[in-house]
From Swiss-Prot:
It is found in: Cytoplasm. It comes from Helicobacter pylori (strain G27). Belongs to the RbfA family. Its main location: cytoplasm. Keywords: Cytoplasm, Ribosome biogenesis. This is Ribosome-binding factor A. InterPro entries: KH_dom-like_a/b, RbfA, RbfA_dom_sf, Ribosome-bd_factorA_CS. GO terms for biological process: maturation of SSU-rRNA. GO terms for cellular component: cytoplasm. Monomer. Binds 30S ribosomal subunits, but not 50S ribosomal subunits or 70S ribosomes. It comes from the Bacteria. The keyword Cell membrane does not apply. One of several proteins that assist in the late maturation steps of the functional core of the 30S ribosomal subunit. Associates with free 30S ribosomal subunits (but not with 30S subunits that are part of 70S ribosomes or polysomes). Required for efficient processing of 16S rRNA. May interact with the 5'-terminal helix region of 16S rRNA. Gene3D superfamilies: 3.30.300.20.
Amino acid sequence: MNAHKERLESNLLELLQEALASLNDGELNSLSVTKVECSKGKHHAYVFVLSSDHKILSKLKKAEGLIRQFVLQASGWFKCPKLSFVLDNSLEKQLRLDAIFNEIAKGKGND
């Protein structure tokens, strides 16, 4: 990955966290943005949020205009990428893998 793209994703992650914190919705204020992946042309960004509630995605979609406006004002950029919000389930996957590895370790210990 090139350094410019990494820097853009890092800046966008910080700006999105600030944008969510500035909203008047308590559910959106408490969301954590875990990762941002920008497309090759940087016209589109996938924003991964930590939540177990699928309803939060519709709230984020409704607030996308305000979020993009905040990012533009705070960054001074000419354009803001289109944002697609995705629930981040990497923590759940990691916990499942840890449980599997623990079971394997217990099985080897009994042999």
